[in-house]
């Protein structure tokens, strides 16, 4: 039986309904029950989905965890080539240039060359769970 301690999912504020439902399913599956192994849940942002929902407070993406990806930015962009049919030309938010821009912008906001951000949905410390 798989017992993950960390789970990554779409943000609840993604405009894509499948992303929103995925988030809801993950949060439901990872209910904080005594037998759960999940101690950390992070949601991530997707250009052309997360920021397009609107600015209702409960749906707003707020980056509160930053991971330095400076050494891996080129690998990230190369990995996106597997989804080439999903990518668009500039000025579309989901262009290679804008994915790179966002990583550099997120990094610059915390003194790094590039960063991936997450919203911490849950963070539990200790062994009692």
Where are these regions (language model features)?
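Metal-dependent de-N-acetylase/amidase catalytic core
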Residues: 1-129
């Amino acid at each position: 039986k798989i017992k993950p301690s960390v789970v990554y999912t779409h943000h609840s504020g993604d405009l894509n309904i499948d992303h929103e439902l995925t988030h809801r399913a993950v949060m439901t599956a990872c209910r904080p029950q005594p037998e759960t192994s999940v101690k950390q849940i992070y949601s991530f942002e997707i250009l052309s989905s997360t920021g397009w929902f609107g600015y209702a407070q409960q749906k707003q993406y707020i980056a509160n965890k930053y991971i330095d990806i400076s050494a891996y930015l080129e690998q990230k962009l190369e990995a996106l080539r597997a989804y080439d049919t999903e990518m668009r030309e500039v000025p579309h938010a989901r262009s290679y240039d804008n994915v790179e821009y966002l990583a550099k912008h997120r990094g610059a906001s915390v003194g790094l060359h590039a960063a991936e951000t997450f919203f911490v949905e849950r963070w539990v410390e200790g062994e009692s769970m």
